[in-house]
Every structure is written in C-alpha cells, then in structure tokens.
Design a protein with these regions (language model features):
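Nucleotide-activated sugar donor-binding and catalytic core shared by glycosyltransferases
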Residues: 1-122
C-alpha cells in the first residue's frame, strides 16, 4: 500500500507492520518517525533524514529503525522481516518503547518544560 496523503496516516500506521518513510532517498530531509513508531511499526527510511537527524540516530542506536542507501537492500530487508516475525516484533517493540520514553513520558516532559521556562528570557 502506498499512501501519499496528509492527515490520514495514523489510520494506516495502525494497520501496518512496516512503514517506509519517503522523502529520504532524495535530499528532502525525510519524514517524522514518531507517529509510526508509537503505532508499533517497523520504520524503514533512506539516508537523507536531516530534518529528524537526532531522532533517527537515537532510533538506530536502539535497533528501532533501518536506514538504507540502496533500494535493492531495502527489498531484501522487507522480505526478511516478513519471514522472521521475531525480528519484526523486536523492532516494533524497540521503536514504540523508545518513542514512549522520549516523547510521552510525563515526568520527562515536565522536566524539559521546567528547564525551558527557567532559561527563557522574560
């Protein structure tokens, strides 16, 4: 399924195991991986993710996404994931846990907001 719409993606993320985020095989900067991660998807992207560089670096360190330079490698990896449910489930779990920890942990968000308020000029 290829989707090129705005505003409908969460519906598709909920029914997908694997999500390829476009705008990343050309120098467009990639797309935000947070929504598919929190919806328990394996995230696959190309190398041009500079709009979300820090997030992707964290996800790569935690085995929560795949970044590919070549379409041929991408095809092989997708086939392997569908053949190995353990790897797919582990990646889905990693991406969801990482996203929950970094973006939806209320204690962490309060800490960040408090620090921003303390350093913000009046």
């Amino acid at each position: 399924l290829i989707v090129n719409t705005f505003g409908n993606l969460p519906t598709y993320f909920n029914i997908s195991d694997i999500v390829f985020l476009g705008g990343s095989f050309v120098s467009k900067g990639g797309h935000n991986p947070i929504e598919p991660a929190i919806n328990n998807c394996v995230i696959i992207t190309g190398p041009h993710v500079y709009n979300w560089q820090n997030i992707y670096e964290d996800m790569l360190r935690n085995n929560a996404c795949f970044v590919f330079n070549k379409i041929s490698i991408l095809e092989k990896k997708i086939k392997k994931l569908f053949e190995d449910n353990n790897e797919m489930n582990k990646m889905k779990e990693n991406s969801k846990k990482l996203t929950q920890k970094n973006f939806f942990d209320s204690d962490r968000l309060i800490y960040i907001i408090k620090n921003l308020i303390e350093v913000a000029p009046c």
